[in-house]
Amino acid sequence: MTKMKRTCAALLAMTTAVSLAGCASSGGGEHGYLLEQETTTALTVAINTETLAPEQEEQVADLADSLTGELENKNVKWLSFYDPWHATTQGNTKPVSMELFEKKYGGEVEYYQTTWANQYSDLSTFVLGGEGIDFFPASEAVPKCVISGMTQPYDPYIDWSSPLWESVSEVNDMFKIAGSHYLMVCQTTEGYVVYYNRKVMEENGFEDPKELYEKGEWTLTKFKDMLLEFVDPEAEHYGLDGWFNCTPLYLASGVPSISISDGKVKSNIMDPDFERAMTYQSELNRNGLILDKSLFDWKTQIQYIGEGKELFYIGGLYEIEQSPDIWTVTFGEPEDVFFVPIPRDEDADKYYYNAEFDCYNLCKGAQNPEGVARLMECVIASYSDENAIEISNEKHKNDFGWTDEMLEMKREVKRLTTENPVRDIYGGMPSETSSIISDAINQPIQGGDWYSVRESITEAVDLSVQEVNDAVAAQ
């Protein structure tokens, strides 16, 4: 779902709402109120129509031969505000999964474009109108789309005993609700990372965060200590930038605000580990370590990293999974740009990591559920096959300007995300509850007192959780 994240990041740079100033994949920022005219970034490049090399074509053909089944209906309909299946002007190229879908099944994905703000209303219109939309982004669809009847289980269309689906069964079971799978998780993908500039680190006497990570010393405490030493607004030295800060940091505790346990939705607002994570963010704000975007027209200042004025920026790998003509404009000279995992919470029992999932939902009334299932298998295969991974790596180097060192760190982030993934699903709660939680968990990093905030929302959140569980059980 990297294209979605890239779009969200671009849009959030344009908003001025204070409530959007902190969280990531489950935070207020990503759940912002986006306008139709804000659905593209300002800087674009020519669409990359380059085809695979002959050797890569052969590798794709071999992988396609390993897939099973036939597909009578070759068209699947995708509803979203972004298109991850085709090359676009944002610098991304056609994914290996789509190469497989075309090669094996002669399949095609028909893109029904919507906006972030209108995606669920458009989905409802299409479902009720019998358009036969097949699938849509799933990051915030469970449980609300289960309750509203906009999605359906995909269990009848896949074989959990097959090697492909067995390889992702555990992560899919994380989101199993009322005995069925509604969230089609094809893979746990790399979560958010910390970007920095090596030249800035060296000039300020800091050890390279990559070396700290390799020694097991890259912790939340070390992260805060480095910010404390660097930040000096009078000298134009700023700390942590980015719209997506709070969620990756609090998920390092291993506890999301809302989760699914034993097939039911559960609130963790009162959990002591969640409390610890919130108070850590209060400390970051209290010490002036978060870039005050109100001083910059509510815009991130990523270019400050390259200029030596900013220490850290939290974002997804999508930030540099695009043409270097785009990302070098914001991050600086490519040899100085690097990233490391979100720091480890040394008080947690494991190195928990904010998880991104390549995941989708099967629409109610889908005209081609079998086609969606086969496409999902192409996606899973593209993540697990060594040749497909190598093709992806070559794309990163040739199309995105990545180095082998970047690819190695990407694999390390993937390992952390796969071993101990944590995902907050409060965005899938009813909109009023989602907004309440979003505003609440943004407060500490903006200077709010977590204890008073928590007291003000606990009763409402608990009631909503009970109502959601009752509604799911009644389906």
Outline where the language-model segments fall.
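Conserved N-terminal structural module of periplasmic/extracytoplasmic solute-binding proteins
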Residues: 9, 23-144, 148, 367, ...
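Short helix-initiation/N-cap motifs at beta->coil->alpha
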Residues: 113-122, 216-222, 293-307
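Extracytoplasmic/periplasmic solute-binding protein
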Residues: 77-79, 177-188, 192-194, 219-266
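Short, solvent-exposed loop/beta-turn-alpha elements that line the ligand-binding surface or hinge
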Residues: 155-167, 212-215, 256-276, 329, ...
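Glycine-centered hinge/linker elements that transmit conformational signals in sensory
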Residues: 225-227, 262-297
